[in-house]
Amino acid sequence: MLTIDHQAGVTLLRLQRPERGNALGPMLVEGLISAASEAFANTSVHTLVLQGEGRHFCTGLDLSDLATLSDADLLLRLVRIETLLAMLWHAPIRTVAQAKGRTWGAGADLL
């Protein structure tokens, strides 16, 4: 779902769900939160780069299971995405999103 590469002070986070347009499912969001937290805590990292594997950067929130989610589960999913977005907005290092193709909804918010 997510690959993490470190090189010369740059942490690259690559969304790995090309078959779903790199839509933000719960596991991917949690992986991004964890990886970003680690990058921000590492004093040798000066830049965080986000990329999407395949044709699209990120098509937003994964709604494929929306019909099966309770209101509480949907709210939690939205809160976690907002947590990720707030982390990136207030990042102590440079953040770069290399967007291509479709970049919708919460995917556009990553920019």
Report residues per predicted region.
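Conserved CoA-thioester-binding segment of acyl-CoA-metabolizing enzymes
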Residues: 1-53, 86
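Hydrophobic/aromatic residues within transmembrane alpha-helices
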Residues: 13, 50, 62, 110-111
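Histidine-centered beta-alpha loop that forms part of the nucleotide-sugar donor binding/catalytic region
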Residues: 16, 61, 100
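Residues that form or flank phosphate/diphosphate-binding pockets in enzymes
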Residues: 23, 58, 106
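Structured helix-beta-strand junction loops
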Residues: 42, 53, 69, 91-94
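Glycine- (often His-adjacent) and acidic-residue-rich active-site loop
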Residues: 52-86, 103
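Glycine-rich beta-to-alpha active-site loop
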Residues: 85-111
